C-alpha cells in the first residue's frame, strides 16, 4: 500500500509541475496586466509628470500638451540623495531631478511659462501626489492627467484617490515603456523588479506603511 501512496504522490507532483508549466505564462502576464490603468485622453486642467523615468514621462506629457490636453504641465520636486546633492554642490551635476524634468519638457516643446514647478521636496509617490493634490486645490483645478509608466499606474490611481479625497479627478496616461505588460516581462530583470516593487508598494499602501519603505 505504501508504494501505491508514493506513486499517487509522484503523479500528483508531476501533474502540479505540468500545470505550473502550462499556466505560468498566462498567470504572470495577468499579474502584469492587473497593474496597468490607461484611460482615453480628455482635456484636463493640468498634466502631472509623476516623478521618475526622465525623459520618457516628460516626452509623453509634452505630446499631450501639444495636442491640447491641458494648458499646463506640473513637475514635482523630487528629493535628491546625499550623493546627488554632493554632485550638485560640486558642480559635477548641473541640475537636480526637477531641473532635468523642466529642461526635458522645454526640449519637447513645452514653454517654460506653461510649466508649474512645486517647491515641496517629496520622497515617495504618496507625498508627491499629496503635494499635487494640495496645489490643485489651491489653484482650483478639478481634473488632472497623471503621466506614469504602465506598471506604476494602478498604485498611482489608488494613491490619488486617497490623497485627493475623490474631489479632484485624476486620469491616468501611461507612457510607452520597454517593460510592456503584454510581453514576457518576467524574463527581464529590470521589469521583474518593477513588478515586484509595485506589488510590495500596493501591500505597503494597504497596510499604510509606505513611509517605512523609502
Residue ranges, per PLM feature:
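A structural signal for short, hydrophobic/glycine-enriched beta-strand patches
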Residues: 26-187
Amino acid at each position: 500500500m505504501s508504494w501505491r501512496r508514493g506513486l499517487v504522490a509522484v503523479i500528483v507532483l508531476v501533474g502540479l509541475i505540468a500545470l505550473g508549466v502550462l499556466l505560468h505564462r498566462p498567470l504572470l502576464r495577468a499579474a502584469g496586466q492587473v497593474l496597468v490603468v490607461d484611460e482615453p485622453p480628455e482635456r484636463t486642467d493640468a498634466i502631472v509628470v509623476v516623478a521618475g523615468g526622465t525623459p520618457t514621462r516628460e516626452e509623453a506629457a509634452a505630446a499631450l500638451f501639444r495636442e491640447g490636453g491641458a494648458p499646463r504641465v506640473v513637475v514635482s520636486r523630487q528629493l535628491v540623495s546625499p550623493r546627488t546633492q554632493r554632485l550638485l554642490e560640486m558642480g559635477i551635476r548641473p541640475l537636480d531631478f526637477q531641473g532635468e524634468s523642466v529642461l526635458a519638457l522645454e526640449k519637447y516643446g513645452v514653454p517654460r511659462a506653461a510649466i508649474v514647478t512645486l517647491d515641496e521636496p517629496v520622497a515617495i509617490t504618496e507625498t508627491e501626489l499629496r503635494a499635487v493634490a494640495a496645489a490643485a486645490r489651491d489653484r482650483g483645478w478639478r481634473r488632472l492627467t497623471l503621466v506614469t509608466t504602465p506598471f506604476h499606474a494602478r498604485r498611482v490611481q489608488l494613491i490619488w484617490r486617497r490623497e485627493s479625497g475623490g474631489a479632484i479627478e485624476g486620469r491616468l496616461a501611461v507612457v510607452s515603456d520597454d517593460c510592456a505588460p503584454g510581453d514576457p516581462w518576467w524574463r527581464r530583470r529590470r521589469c521583474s523588479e518593477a513588478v515586484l516593487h509595485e506589488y510590495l508598494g500596493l501591500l505597503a499602501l494597504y497596510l499604510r506603511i509606505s513611509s517605512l519603505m523609502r
